[in-house]
Amino acid sequence: MNTWLNLKDNVIIVTGGASGIGLAIVDELLSQGAHVQMIDIHGGDRHHNGDNYHFWSTDISSATEVQQTIDAIIQRWSRIDGLVNNAGVNFPRLLVDEKAPAGRYELNEAAFEKMVNINQKGVFFMSQAVARQMVKQRAGVIVNVSSESGLEGSEGQSCYAATKAALNSFTRSWSKELGKYGIRVVGVAPGILEKTGLRTPEYEEALAWTRNITVEQLREGYTKNAIPIGRAGKLSEVADFVCYLLSARASYITGVTTNIAGGKTRG
């Protein structure tokens, strides 16, 4: 067990923890001895329920489901030490697509609402339900997983970028509201990462189309041309920093969203 962050026995909720960044965060928290409460639609197959891990099948876009899950966690543990708002969806779309048949890659209401419901409303529902308990405790940490897109915008991802920009605003505003209760609110904005399991061929095809390049050019440009450090980030690099923010070692950090982008995004 790795104990340098002193997260042993902390009760920490991670949304979207079945794959990608979320799974990397879950793995690191478990290595630190935390009691991880993983919220997702699907549980994945790496971890199974036990003393230090519990999977909750919850639709975070439903305020009712979220409250029921948080109530159950509080009933079991009597406290919540940390929340990582990681769950999110992204459907690359252009505002106007005059080239694809029938506007295949044009932003539509269904895609717009799905991204807003998960990425924005889901974070609101989770944070409010958890913050009510943290206010009673006079302690806690909320980490919002944003994106470089939320800091600088992104071609073909306007709605996704807008939802992530909203998270950055949540982080700034909630830190001011909750600081007096001993609650910190912080964010991370990952850049281009190694394949996460969420970047499907369909996703890459759509994103490449919105930028008028090939999938091969997309991959080449991402890793070699756009990042000063010369490589994509590792999931573990994001997870390590998130766990640091959850720990008392970061006790004077609140209200900021930190880039983890290899120098690609500045601001």
Swiss-Prot record:
It is an enzyme of class 1 (oxidoreductase). Substrate binds at residue 147. Belongs to the short-chain dehydrogenases/reductases (SDR) family. It comes from the Bacteria. InterPro entries: NAD(P)-bd_dom_sf, Sc_DH/Rdtase_CS, SDR_fam. Pathway: Carbohydrate metabolism; D-sorbitol degradation; D-fructose 6-phosphate from D-sorbitol 6-phosphate: step 1/1. This is Sorbitol-6-phosphate 2-dehydrogenase. CDD domains: SDR_c. The active site is at 160 (proton acceptor). GO terms for molecular function: quinone binding; sorbitol-6-phosphate 2-dehydrogenase activity. Its EC number is 1.1.1.140. NAD(+) binds at residues 9-38.
